[in-house]
Amino acid sequence: MRNEEKGGAMFPLEPREAPFSDIGVNVRVVWPGDPNALYHSEGVQEGFLVLSGKCTLIVEEEERPLLQWDYFHCPAGTRHVIVGAGDGPCAILMIGARPDVDVRYPVSPAAAKYGASAAKETDEPDEAYADWPGEYLPIRLAWPFDSDANPRQ
């Protein structure tokens, strides 16, 4: 699935009608310059494994490059977002705990460079994502990725 303009393509690895109750698992594909989400922190831990391509991790206002097979363990409460980098798409395996979770969207100068900062600090997703376009739509991308495979171009 993908959002027309932001967030990349998302491939849930669980059925929509019966999601796992304890964890969320998906593969997210982002293109150069595109964030996977808004800069945020959650009350649970997450893990991110780069399957292919390059991306930039913004964590606690610092930018860090990630390459294929790099892994980032994100402890609960850590502010973060991932932005596509390099010349083509980047696929990331994302795993996170899924109990009722507190999410916070702080204002971030580092993330704002990529359009990945909330306009004002909030803990309301609808408020934080108010300027992001609509729903995720089903899509299939070829694997391995072709650097020209960006469906938005």
What does each of the following model-derived ranges do?
Residues 56, 68, 76-102:
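Ligand-binding loop in jelly-roll beta-barrel domains
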Residues 9-13, 26-42, 76:
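Conserved short histidine dyad/triad with adjacent acidic residue
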Residues 1-23, 110-153:
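A short, N-terminal "cap"/entry segment at the start of jelly-roll beta-barrel domains
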Residues 27-32, 40-58, 95-97:
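Short, conserved beta-strand element in jelly-roll/cupin
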Residues 21-26, 44-46, 53, 76-78, ...:
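A generic structural signal for short beta-strands and their flanking turns/coil linkers
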Residues 47, 61-77:
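Short acidic-glycine-tyrosine-enriched beta hairpin
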